[in-house]
Regions:
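Conserved nucleotide-sensing/catalytic segment adjacent to the nucleotide-binding pocket
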Residues: 2-16
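P-loop NTPase motor-domain active sites and their immediate coupling elements
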Residues: 13, 17-239
Length: 239
């Protein structure tokens, strides 16, 4: 969980790098998406374990010189990459991120929205201030699926859905949903989830596996020019 908007921008930059690395891995094994990659890794893992057992059996209880041992080590089967996990990125308030890092944040969001789905990285973006400087045209164009709760004006409704109607909703979970691939709006109702239920869900998720934290997510990335991204955004006269 990232609460500092500046660190959130760094986390988005990490997500872009992770997406690019995943595409390189998928390109090497000749698959188009994360599903194909994980299926192929399962197959290669089974083949690797069979080859490893055969290799260990062939070299068991044998006394050989260092030179022969080094040659046999080179014949040892190569372990395939691990399967790729799915990543869900949830931005609770886009307005805060856009105020702190509008340029870098918009670029990262756009790239992730355009390409990240096939690599197993998905985005949920929310805001309580649906203005055009927060939900820019570039961001909206790359988020085909949208939801709007009750808003105060027609302008806000058009900003989110490109259509009026959200200003007439009843509130308390009443919403309009735009499915991907269509501009037809569906009126649906969200479920009320209490704090107690949220804690139960979190506890259930924690029971599945212990969290693995990656400290490198917040490391300052270095650009091709040798400057850090943070330094590029720094304006001496303004700051």
């Amino acid at each position: 969980v990232v609460t500092n908007p500046k660190k959130a921008a760094a986390a988005l930059s990490w997500a872009v790098d992770e997406m690019e690395n995943r595409y390189k891995l998928m390109s090497k094994v000749g698959v188009r998406n994360i599903t194909g990659f994980n299926v192929k890794m399962d197959t290669e893992r089974e083949e690797y374990e069979m080859k490893l057992k055969q290799w260990e059996h062939d070299n068991k209880n044998s006394v050989k010189s260092d030179e022969i041992e080094s040659e046999e080590e080179s014949d040892k089967p190569t372990e395939p990459p691990e399967k790729l996990p799915y990543i869900l990125i949830v931005i609770d308030e886009l307005a805060d991120l856009m105020m702190v890092a509008s340029k870098g944040g918009e670029e990262a969001l756009t790239r992730l929205a355009q390409m990240a789905r096939a690599s197993g990285i998905h985005l949920i973006v929310a805001t309580q201030r649906p203005s055009v400087d927060v939900l820019t045209g570039i961001i909206k164009a790359n988020f085909p699926s949208r939801i709007s709760y009750k808003v105060t004006s027609r302008v806000d409704s058009r900003t989110i859905l490109d259509s009026m109607g959200a200003e007439k909703l009843l509130g308390k979970g009443d919403m309009l949903f735009m499915p991907p691939g269509t501009h037809r709006l569906l009126r649906i109702h969200g479920a009320m989830v209490s704090d107690e239920e949220i804690q139960k869900i979190i506890s259930f998720i924690k029971e599945q596996k212990k969290p693995t934290y990656k400290d490198q997510i917040f490391e300052v990335a270095v650009t091709d020019k040798g400057k850090t991204k943070e330094a590029e955004d720094y304006d001496e006269r303004y700051d």
